[in-house]
């Protein structure tokens, strides 16, 4: 009987309204674990699991996507912050980049990995051709000269939620992922109570739905093949 209650609860989650955070998300989790007010599980515990879930979802699903620029500087090839002051340490994955030339030409950069750098051909300093993401830095090669200095490279990336409070981090999460956030927190709550069957089943459902949503939204093959 309990298993059917869990399944019905999961199916109802996407249709629930959200207003005041993080209180609403705590109530959503309490609805799943069947504890309307704090008794065995405190609100602080549930909020901590929600925060952990946001990090897990944004890292696995690459769902918090945005773009920014890097301002090139003469003879500098690695950058730790963007023009908009985003720390590269908060970036989960760089999805693409292009260089904006002084003539407003847009030149796509090829992604490489750090272990490929030794295989690159000799390159004189000049306009960028390659980029890599390694050790909380974004590298851009070849080295820019004074001609390229202050020009921009625009990068598209998935990052961790950036809000200063839990309410803002929940707001950073795309709406379609929020029901999965409640499943994650509920699985952690049941684990605390040593209800490992419910915890494992809920976490497995969380992972299954997360992977399915990621495939549907972000792993779609491009409609136009690049040359």
Task: Give the location of each predicted region.
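Sec/Tat signal peptide C-region and signal peptidase I cleavage site
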Residues: 13-19
């Amino acid at each position: 009987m309990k298993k059917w209650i869990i399944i019905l609860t999961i199916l109802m989650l996407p249709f629930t309204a959200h207003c005041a955070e993080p209180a609403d998300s705590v109530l959503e989790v309490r609805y799943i674990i069947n504890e309307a007010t704090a008794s065995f599980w405190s609100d602080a515990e549930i909020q901590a699991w929600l925060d952990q879930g946001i990090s897990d979802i944004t890292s696995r699903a690459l769902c918090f996507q945005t773009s920014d620029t890097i301002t090139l500087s003469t003879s500098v090839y690695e950058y730790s912050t963007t023009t908009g002051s985003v720390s590269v340490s908060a970036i989960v994955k760089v999805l693409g980049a292009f260089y904006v030339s002084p003539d407003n030409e847009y030149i796509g950069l090829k992604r490489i990995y750090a272990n490929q750098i030794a295989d690159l051909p000799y390159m004189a300093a000049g306009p960028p051709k390659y980029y890599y993401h390694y050790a909380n830095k974004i590298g851009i090669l070849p080295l820019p000269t004074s001609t390229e200095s202050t020009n921009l490279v625009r990068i598209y990336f998935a990052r961790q939620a950036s809000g200063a409070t839990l309410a803002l981090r929940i707001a950073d999460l795309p709406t379609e992922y929020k029901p999965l956030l409640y499943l994650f927190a509920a699985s952690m709550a049941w684990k605390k109570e040593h209800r490992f069957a419910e915890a494992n089943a809920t976490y497995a459902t969380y992972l299954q739905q997360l992977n399915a949503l990621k495939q549907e939204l972000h792993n779609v093959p491009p409609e136009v093949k690049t040359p």
